[in-house]
Amino acid sequence: MIKYGVTIYVYGRVQGVGFRYQTFRWAKLNRLTGYVCNLHDGSVKIVAYGDSEQLNTLTHWLEQGGPPGARIDNFSSQSCAVEDIADFIVRH
């Protein structure tokens, strides 16, 4: 399996609504590695590694609104180098 990396910045009502935890659960279920963290501007950063199908599924999940309780106004994504991370974690 060829691994790819993507960095996604998510904007909207994405802090204080369980977004990081739900993203963590979703990523674990879909066997992605990487991390999710809150940013000081109120957005959330997701760095995810997986095959192209896994990453496309993540993007589709965000397009569909992501976790319940969140309101995604928009998000941007770009490719990134793959790091050797064995799991998906929530960074604080």
Curated annotation (Swiss-Prot):
Residues 5-92 form the Acylphosphatase-like domain. SUPFAM superfamilies: Acylphosphatase/BLUF domain-like. It catalyses: an acyl phosphate + H2O = a carboxylate + phosphate + H(+). Its EC number is 3.6.1.7. The active site is at R20, N38. This is Acylphosphatase. PROSITE patterns: ACYLPHOSPHATASE_1, ACYLPHOSPHATASE_3. Belongs to the acylphosphatase family. InterPro entries: Acylphosphatase, Acylphosphatase-like_dom, Acylphosphatase-like_dom_sf, Acylphosphatase_bac, Acylphosphatase_CS. Keywords: Hydrolase. It holds the Pfam family Acylphosphatase. GO terms for molecular function: acylphosphatase activity. The gene is acyP. HAMAP family: Acylphosphatase_entero. PANTHER family: ACYLPHOSPHATASE (PTHR47268:SF4).
